[in-house]
Each structure stands twice: as structure tokens, then as C-alpha cells.
């Protein structure tokens, strides 16, 4: 009897390769299922893995079966209806090879295929194909991160980095340099010996002939004494550590918490900013996030207060934009930082403040920002702030974006639209 001992390193997850192949093959269907799951989850569970379902028809493999046409000769037991040589009509629908998997008034149908995604896999699909737009400013920061690059050839190094071609070339040049004079003299001696050997033996100068033979032997010995490869010849590939320029980015999350924002609207805004927060934390290690809440006045808050504070009031949107500009001037130089802004509001604003918002964005923020997005959350018609911002989008389509969210189901599609990776 044969025994098979499985010593694979991933013994607890032996089908990992097959699983990854499955996830790659049905990436589009899984991404759509993840999108549905994000829309239906609570805020607390939005970043967790779990069960997702894709239509079974999307994972069916192609099969080869008999077609409806053609003729076959078979020997079948006879009966009172058929005699020898009769042709039997092929039954209709018998070649599809499917007997149906559930009761249906239409005669066909299949259950969805359900499986579980880990948290890591779920987040991979959630943020697949997304990036911060225009992330171009790179600086050598104080972070100790390097990459190894080739820096030519060195005379010393590790045995594993020896450059064989350069070493042999160096050895060959050394041997040529050290033996050039001896080889030249050896050619002269051999030429003279050839002349003497061409003479009749009776008239040959024997003393001279013997002396030349002895000199040729000494030259051969001296040339062969030169080592074929010396430690001096060894050359090594040199690699040095080169500091990696880092992209320094900051995202300003601006949320309207005024009295016109009811609890449902605030929950939609929070879900959007949670998605943005997870996206930045997962994809960009060195990204600052500044949280700003505003009603009639604005203030910078921490993560916990941003998502859980119940403070409310009137609506003056420009207060948040002024605070954002002040923070940029104080802490984030546009020469070094990639600056982004995301603003969520129901669009309601006080009096003529919308014009002030437009002037602040055009004159102060957009010259410093790489990208600014405004998300209006309302099931009704657009408010004055949206109409004012449309003028800004018309003038700066690459740096300013507008999106409209009606309900929870629109959050994830809008998020992907804002941060979809641009094709070069």
C-alpha cells in the first residue's frame, strides 16, 4: 500500500492556489457582489469579510454535447410500434444536458453560488482599481526607506556577486600585459630557430641553435608561470542603497453637521467618509487625514469626534473652507504635499455664502490642491451650493468633481467614480 505525506507549507490552506485562480477568473462578478454587500451592510461591518453570492450561470463551464441533427445506427429491442429499419425521431431538448435544478414556472433557473471572502480579500475587491488622482509630488523625506540599485563594478565584494565576464576580461588583460615582452621575444626566437632548421644540418650553427632552444624553453616557462586567474582580477557587481522619494499626501474630510442635515443624511455622509478612510489607510501608508466638522463655525476634530459627535447648528459652509486653507498654510506646503479635499453636505447654505465658497475654492484651495470633490446628499433637487460649484467644475474639470448621492445604495458607485484609476 502506498502512503502520501503532504509536506506543503500551506498545509492548512491547500487549495490557496485554486482559490486565487477562481478569484482572478471571476473578478468582475465578485466585485459587483462586493458592491452590493457594501451598500447593504451597517457602518460597523462595512470593512469586514463575509459571504457574497454571484449568479451560478456566470461560473458555468463550457461543455461539449451532441447537437440536434445527425443520424446514428443503433441496435434496439423491437416492439409493436417499430420494425427493422424504422427511423426514430430524436426527442426535442434532449441534447442540452441540463435537467433543471429547481422548480420554476418557466422551466429553468439556478441558485446563486455563495462563498466567503476574508477581510483581506473583501478590501482588495472593494478598492481594486482606485487611486488618488494626480499624485505626482515626491520628496525625499526623513523616512529610512531605500532600494538597492546597480552602481557599477567593485574590486571587493561577496562571492555571490562576482561578475564572471569582467573577472575573466581583467585576467586576460593582466596576462597580456605581463607577458607581452616575453611573447615578442619568443616570436623572434622561434623565427630564428625556423631559419636555422631550414639550413642543412652540416652548415647549421649548433651552438646558436642550442642556445635558442634553451632561451625558448625559458620563455615558455616564464609565460606559463603567470597565473591564469589572480585575486586581483576578481570583479564584483556593486549595489548601493538609494533613498526612495515618498509621495506625501493629505486628505481633508469636510462634513456638514448643520441642522438641515437629518440623521439619515449624516449616516450617508459618515458611510462615505468611512470608505474614504479605509481606502487611504489601506492603500497609502504615509497619508495624513484632517477631519473638519462645520455648522455656522468649523473646527478640526479627531477621528472619534468626527464620526460620533452630536454637535449641530446653522449652516455656513465657507467656515470649513477657510479653516482648510488656514491649516494648509500652517502645516502643509503645496510644494511638498499632494493636497486633497472631500466635502459632503446636503447643499443647504446660508444667504450669499455660496459665492464666498466659490471664491475660496477658486482663489485659495484649487491652486494648492491636486483634487477636490464635493458630494451632495439629498433626494430632492440640487441646492444653491451645487449650482455655484457647477461653475467651478466647468472651469476646472480635472481638479474639481461633483457627485450626487440620493441613498445608501449610491455611496459605493459614487466613491468608485471619484477615485477611479485614470488610464494614461
Swiss-Prot record:
UniProt region (Disordered), positions on chain: 61-112
Pfam family for this entry, one: DUF444
Database matches in InterPro entries: UPF0229
Family stated for the protein in its record: Belongs to the UPF0229 family.
PANTHER family named in the record: UPF0229 PROTEIN YEAH
Matches recorded under NCBIfam families: PRK05325.1-2, PRK05325.1-3
Name the record gives this protein: UPF0229 protein CJA_2563
Amino acid at each position: 500500500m502506498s502512503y502520501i505525506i503532504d509536506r506543503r507549507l500551506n498545509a492548512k490552506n491547500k487549495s490557496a492556489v485554486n482559490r486565487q485562480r477562481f478569484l482572478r477568473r471571476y473578478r468582475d462578478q465578485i466585485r459587483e457582489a462586493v458592491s452590493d454587500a457594501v451598500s447593504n451592510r451597517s457602518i460597523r461591518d462595512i470593512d469586514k469579510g463575509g459571504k457574497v453570492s454571484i449568479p451560478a450561470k456566470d461560473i458555468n463551464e463550457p461543455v461539449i454535447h451532441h447537437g440536434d441533427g445527425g443520424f446514428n445506427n443503433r441496435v434496439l429491442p423491437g416492439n409493436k410500434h417499430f420494425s427493422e429499419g424504422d427511423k426514430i425521431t430524436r426527442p426535442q431538448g434532449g441534447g442540452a444536458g441540463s435537467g433543471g435544478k429547481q422548480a420554476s414556472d418557466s422551466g429553468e433557473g439556478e441558485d446563486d453560488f455563495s462563498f466567503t471572502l476574508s477581510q483581506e480579500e473583501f478590501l482588495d475587491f472593494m478598492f481594486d482599481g482606485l487611486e488618488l488622482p494626480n499624485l505626482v509630488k515626491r520628496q525625499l523625506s526623513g523616512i529610512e526607506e531605500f532600494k538597492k540599485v546597480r552602481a557599477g563594478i567593485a574590486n571587493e565584494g561577496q562571492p555571490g556577486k562576482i561578475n564572471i565576464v569582467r573577472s575573466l576580461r581583467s585576467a586576460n588583460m593582466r596576462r597580456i600585459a605581463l607577458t607581452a615582452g616575453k611573447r615578442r621575444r619568443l616570436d623572434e626566437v622561434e623565427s630564428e630557430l625556423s631559419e636555422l632548421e631550414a639550413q642543412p644540418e652540416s652548415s647549421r650553427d649548433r651552438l646558436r641553435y642550442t642556445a635558442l632552444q634553451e632561451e625558448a624553453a625559458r620563455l615558455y616557462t616564464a609565460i606559463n608561470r603567470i597565473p591564469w586567474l589572480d585575486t586581483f582580477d576578481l570583479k564584483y557587481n556593486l549595489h548601493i542603497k538609494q533613498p526612495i522619494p515618498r509621495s506625501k499626501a493629505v486628505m481633508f474630510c469636510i462634513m456638514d453637521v448643520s441642522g438641515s442635515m437629518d440623521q439619515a443624511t449624516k449616516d450617508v455622509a459618515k458611510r462615505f467618509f468611512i470608505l474614504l478612510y479605509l481606502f487611504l489607510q489601506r492603500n497609502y501608508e504615509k497619508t495624513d487625514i484632517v477631519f473638519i466638522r462645520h455648522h455656522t463655525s468649523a473646527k478640526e476634530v479627531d477621528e472619534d469626534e468626527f464620526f460620533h459627535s452630536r454637535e449641530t447648528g446653522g449652516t455656513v459652509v465657507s467656515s470649513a473652507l477657510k479653516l482648510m486653507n488656514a491649516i494648509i498654510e500652517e502645516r502643509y506646503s503645496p510644494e511638498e504635499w499632494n493636497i486633497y479635499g472631500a466635502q459632503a453636505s446636503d447643499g443647504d447654505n446660508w444667504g450669499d455664502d455660496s459665492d464666498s465658497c466659490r471664491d475660496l475654492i477658486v482663489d485659495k484651495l484649487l491652486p494648492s490642491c491636486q483634487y477636490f470633490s464635493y458630494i451632495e446628499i439629498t433626494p430632492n433637487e440640487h441646492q444653491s451650493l451645487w449650482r455655484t460649484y457647477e461653475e467651478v467644475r466647468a472651469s476646472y474639470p480635472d481638479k474639481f468633481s461633483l457627485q450626487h448621492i440620493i441613498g445608501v445604495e449610491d455611496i459605493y458607485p459614487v466613491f468608485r467614480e471619484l477615485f477611479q484609476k485614470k488610464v494614461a
